[in-house]
């Protein structure tokens, strides 16, 4: 069944492939200019003189995962890393800047590149990169793209987005999209989970468990009978890039209700004094490597920078499969 797309704004650039867009009965067929088969398929065309330079720049060869937010009709998406199984590999600064010229070479992240958009683990639209830049607010320099988004109508209110290149994710089908909102029982369950973990890790009790909860999400993983929850609790700290107060810690908990009541499925306790500030916030889930198992993407807030972390399932339990950290204490672990 053909899906009806909602064009959030006028499309200003042509897609790299042929596509149809319809408004009020008017059908526009967008066709690309004629290129060689290598270019039209999205493959890199490398002359012999440039082959060695590309290799020396460390241009990414694996699929790249992007994450970002939509504001109105446009979105800004930042590179998280290269997909490496259920983990991710950071794109190094050396892979972005040419030592010879000082210019940035972004490899697969180029103007006019087409990206498949995801939210809540399902495909919801696309975006064509109109601008490419570098974001220096993270631990390492990160390629960033911006452009106009096209979303399915039921996802018209989505703000948080994850993206993969059309060449990687173009074959993934559209699935029904549902936005999940946490309810009273789930909020109470998150407090119970935190209350269970705090004494087990020897953490100081906050003055109020309720007030220490700074973030909570409900989400539905494929194949699970009930929604899962993820929540972040903070003591003597805030979910921004700012140095913490003495005695600060963060506690991230996830719970599932497969048995009828919520139980801990993953927890991450981090004492800022010994490990450095690293406050996790749930962003979204997606099967980024297409193996049929979902991964979870987290945004991390440090004292001065942002970074990402990822969770994956291993032997039916969640593990931290990736962390790109600014903090030297975490790098050495």
Per-region residue spans from a language model:
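Bacterial N-terminal signal peptides
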Residues: 7-15
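Bacterial signal peptide processing site
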Residues: 19-21
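Solvent-exposed N-terminal domain segments of exported/luminal and surface proteins
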Residues: 70-190
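Repeat-based blade/solenoid architectures
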Residues: 199-216, 270-282, 327-333
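Beta-propeller blade termini
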Residues: 213-227, 280-288
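Acidic/hydrophobic-patterned starts of short beta strands in beta-sheet-rich repeat architectures
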Residues: 222-234, 290-300
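Structural motif
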Residues: 239-253, 304-310
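Surface-exposed loop/turn elements that mediate protein-protein interactions on large endomembrane-trafficking
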Residues: 253-273, 312-320
């Amino acid at each position: 069944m053909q899906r009806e797309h909602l064009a959030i704004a006028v499309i200003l650039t042509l897609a790299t492939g042929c596509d149809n867009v319809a408004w009020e009965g008017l059908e526009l067929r967008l066709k690309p200019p004629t290129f060689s088969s290598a270019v039209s398929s999205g493959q890199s065309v490398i002359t012999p003189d440039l082959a060695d330079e590309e290799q020396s720049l460390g241009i990414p060869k694996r699929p790249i995962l992007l994450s970002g937010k939509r504001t109105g009709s446009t979105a800004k998406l930042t590179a998280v890393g290269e997909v490496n199984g259920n983990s991710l590999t950071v794109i190094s600064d050396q892979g972005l800047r040419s030592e010879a010229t000082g210019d940035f070479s972004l490899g697969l992240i180029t103007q006019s590149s087409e990206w498949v958009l995801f939210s809540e683990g399902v495909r919801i639209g696309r975006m064509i990169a109109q601008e490419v830049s570098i974001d220096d607010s993270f631990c390492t320099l990160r390629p960033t793209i911006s452009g106009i988004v096209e979303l399915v109508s039921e996802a018209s209110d989505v703000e948080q987005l994850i993206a993969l290149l059309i060449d990687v994710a173009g074959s993934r089908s559209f699935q029904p999209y549902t936005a999940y909102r946490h309810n009273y029982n789930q909020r109470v369950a998150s407090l119970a989970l935190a209350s269970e973990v705090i004494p087990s890790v020897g953490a100081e009790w906050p003055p109020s468990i309720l007030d220490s909860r700074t973030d909570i999400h409900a989400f539905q993983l494929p194949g699970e009978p009930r929604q899962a929850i993820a929540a972040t609790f903070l003591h003597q700290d805030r979910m921004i890039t700012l140095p913490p107060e003495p005695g600060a810690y963060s506690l991230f908990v996830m719970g599932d209700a497969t048995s009828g009541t919520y139980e801990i499925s993953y927890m991450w306790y981090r004492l800022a004094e010994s490990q450095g500030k690293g406050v996790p916030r749930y962003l979204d889930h997606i099967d980024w490597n297409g193996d049929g198992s979902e991964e979870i993407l987290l945004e991390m807030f440090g004292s001065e920078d942002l970074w990402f972390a990822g969770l994956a399932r291993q032997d039916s339990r969640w593990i931290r499969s990736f962390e790109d950290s600014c903090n030297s204490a975490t790098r050495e672990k």
